[in-house]
A protein has these predicted regions:
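Cysteine-centered catalytic environments shared across enzyme families
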Residues: 1-287, 313
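ATP-dependent adenylate-handling active sites, centered on carboxylate activation for C-N bond formation
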Residues: 8-10, 116-119, 124-130, 134-136, ...
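Short, surface-exposed acidic
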Residues: 26-27, 79-84, 407-419, 445-448, ...
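Short, hydrophobic secondary-structure boundary micro-motifs
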Residues: 28-29, 215, 392, 414-416
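Short glycine/proline-rich, acidic loop/turn segments that cap or connect secondary-structure elements
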Residues: 169-173, 433-444
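Short linear capping/connector segments at secondary-structure termini
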Residues: 177-181, 416-423, 449-452
Length: 506
């Protein structure tokens, strides 16, 4: 988790400290020809000065915010560091950008230049963030977060996942289409294969850091499985959970921690602490989406605690499973397998705007590197090629639960899906709605609705988050969230998992 800024074309003065929260360990700026690169380092792999970026070699310069998990297989012996990212510069130079991004297994947002031409690329599902803006003729800028491009004063856009950019043709080119073919579902249920691929995804990530490792543990299926796999591999691990006093997540996480014999830390927060953090959370997220803000606030507070009280900087989390396996409760309402499959792919396609965004920004706000094994490209491929009818089960993600029998206590392994904003404590979502009612008069709500041509808020809570977003980024950036996250095939518009259960009990 680092911060990168690139300005290519007309020269511009780039303010410093724009992304120091993402990369608090070091900062460097380099210029080659028409290209300037600014790098904010969070040292994870090769902590020495040799691992500092941008990497500059004769007539080429490169930087990458990311992790390349199979970097050892690409080493030529000419590298000057042990950094997992340095090998990518040599690959781009020898085999080209398209062949490089198709070959590597990693989470990345990268930029390469020879001073006359700039190339940029983002991983297939957008685990690592990247934005761009065209600020002048034949000029383009890239950055890890939208806030780092605001100074240029031009429209900011999301760099599309699974694409690379080439200034020679001045366009974005899709290099990855493997997950998006609705007719490409012929696989069978194979518990051993699912287990092996996910375990491998965790193991290669455990082996890719020189920093102390931690695990976010909500007590739900996904984060608990990641912790269980890691504990079997490396022994005693360090886990962290957060919730309001007496919350379901804290209780469930405690059971998992005891079962796995982890070094466990519980962090409690109050409603007032959460409400006070909202403006900072929205600034960090660059989002006004309701479920994202609700779930991000406790996660943001937990990451803040980890940064301030531990040496853990390489943090595992469980995002991605619901998007890959159709794990959200509203998927039970899918009328047929075709619609289930299409919505499954749509959720994965948009993860970089919702759960993926939450994971990256909450950790990045506090200089932590968040690792998401469920979004390993091999695991995604395995699950998306599966016969989709195998995902349409009475209890969500049964195929995953069955593959990992014995890894967790049964009451956790077979625990029903609960949204993070619900499970951190029954009072949290209610308190947010009540707070929004106090902050937004009926007239103010009406005015805000009228100002929102895109993603018009349906509730005062949604309008309140939009107002907080405007304080940080103004209405010109509303388009950075393509839609508000809402369940499908139901009259419920609130994203709360508990409301879905109450409205559509099994």
């Amino acid at each position: 988790m680092c911060g990168i800024i690139t300005v290519f074309g007309e020269e511009r003065d780039v303010p410093t400290d724009l992304l120091s929260h993402r990369g608090p360990d070091d900062y460097r700026t380099e210029t080659m020809g028409k290209c300037r690169m600014d790098f904010y380092r969070l040292a994870i792999n090769d902590l020495s000065a040799a691992g500092m970026q941008p990497f500059v070699r004769l007539n080429r310069m490169f930087m990458c915010n990311g992790e390349i998990y199979d970097h050892r297989s690409f080493r030529s012996g000419d590298e000057r560091s042990k950094s997992d990212c340095e090998v990518v510069m040599n690959l781009v130079h020898t085999i080209g950008i398209e062949n490089t991004v198709k070959s590597i297994n990693g989470d990345f947002a990268m930029v390469y230049t020879d001073g006359k031409r700039v190339l940029a690329a983002r991983d297939p599902v957008g685990v690592r963030p990247l934005f761009y803006t065209r600020y002048a003729k034949d000029s383009i800028a890239f950055a890890s977060e939208a806030k780092a491009l605001v100074f240029l004063g031009t429209r900011i856009e999301i760099f599309p996942p699974g694409h690379f950019y080439d200034s020679y043709v001045n366009t974005f080119i899709c290099y990855h289409t493997g997950y998006w073919n609705v007719h490409k579902f012929s696989g069978t249920k194979n518990h051993e294969r699912i287990r092996h691929i996910l375990e491998d995804a965790v193991h290669i990530r455990l082996d890719n850091t020189d920093r102390e490792i931690g695990f976010l543990l909500s007590g739900g299926l996904d984060s608990s499985l990641i912790a269980a796999i890691a504990a079997r591999k490396i022994g005693r691990i360090r886990t962290f959970s957060i919730g309001l006093e007496g919350s379901p997540d804290l209780e469930a996480a405690r059971k998992v921690a005891t079962y796995l014999a982890t070094d466990h830390t519980e962090v409690t927060f109050t409603v007032d602490e959460g409400l006070r953090a909202l403006r900072q959370v929205v600034w960090s997220l660059e989002s006004y989406d309701t479920t994202t803000v609700r779930a991000s606030t406790p996660m943001w507070l937990l990451c803040k605690y980890i940064k301030e009280n531990t040496d853990c900087r390489y943090i595992f989390s469980g995002e991605g499973s619901d998007e890959i396996l159709g794990g959200y409760l509203y998927f039970h309402n899918a009328p047929n397998v075709d619609e289930f499959a299409c919505e499954n792919m749509r959720r994965l396609h948009l993860i970089h705007q919702f759960d993926g965004l939450r994971a990256d920004r909450c950790a990045g706000a506090h200089g932590l590197d968040l690792i998401v094994p469920f979004l390993d490209k091999n695991f995604i491929q395995c699950c998306m090629e599966m016969n989709q009818t195998l995902k349409m089960t009475k209890l969500e993600k049964e195929v995953l639960r069955e593959a990992f029998k014995g890894y967790l206590p049964d009451e956790v392994l077979w625990r029903q899906k609960d949204g993070m904003s619900d499970a951190v404590g029954t009072g949290w979502v209610g308190a947010l709605k009540e707070h929004a009612e106090k902050m937004m008069s009926d007239r103010m709500f009406e005015i805000t609705q009228g100002m929102c041509k895109h993603n018009t808020p349906l509730t005062k809570e949604e309008a309140y988050y939009r107002e907080l977003f405007w304080v940080c980024y103004d209405a010109r950036n509303d388009h950075l969230i393509s839609e508000i996250w809402r369940p499908k095939w139901t009259t419920v518009t609130d994203p709360s998992a508990r409301l879905l259960i109450e409205k559509n009990p099994k």
